[in-house]
Amino acid sequence: MAAMKKAMKVKKSAKKSAKKSGKKGGMKKKAKRVSKVARGKRAKSSVFRGTKERTSGGLTKNSLVKNKQGRVVSKKQSEHGKKIFKKHGLQKWIDAVTKARKALGIKGFQAVGGSSAKGKILLAKSRSFYKK
């Protein structure tokens, strides 16, 4: 038992040596470089305004344009969309429906087709104008 109850040895305190001085001076931290690339939801608008240089997709100010609603969109995509709208007959159909609404004297909302009698008449009239 005497062996187990040995008193803990007291550590001799080492002589304190003179503290070494740390690095003197050093380099000044550089400010972070401001990004020229616009990211996120308002990326195109910030490039269009001129606050950023380009979008993450690579669009620059000269490749952006405002659409009818005032949104900043890609010039190339906008032109392509307009071309497809005319090419695939959607423009022709919209013109036909507009003409039919005018001929039938329909104002306000009216579903083309559907279950109502007015809607069915409008659809038939629209189709007749579309085929011409």
From Swiss-Prot:
More about this protein: In yeast, DVNP5 binds to histone binding sites in chromatin and displaces nucleosomes, and impairs transcription and inhibits cell growth.
Function as written in the Swiss-Prot or TrEMBL entry: DNA-binding protein, which similarly to histones, may compact DNA into chromatin.
Keyword tags: Chromosome, DNA condensation, DNA-binding, Nucleus, Phosphoprotein
Major subcellular location class: nucleus
Post-translational modification, as annotated: Phosphorylated.
GO cellular component: chromosome; nucleus
Places the protein is found: Nucleus; Chromosome
Protein name: Dinoflagellate viral nucleoprotein 5
Biased composition (Polar residues): 57-66
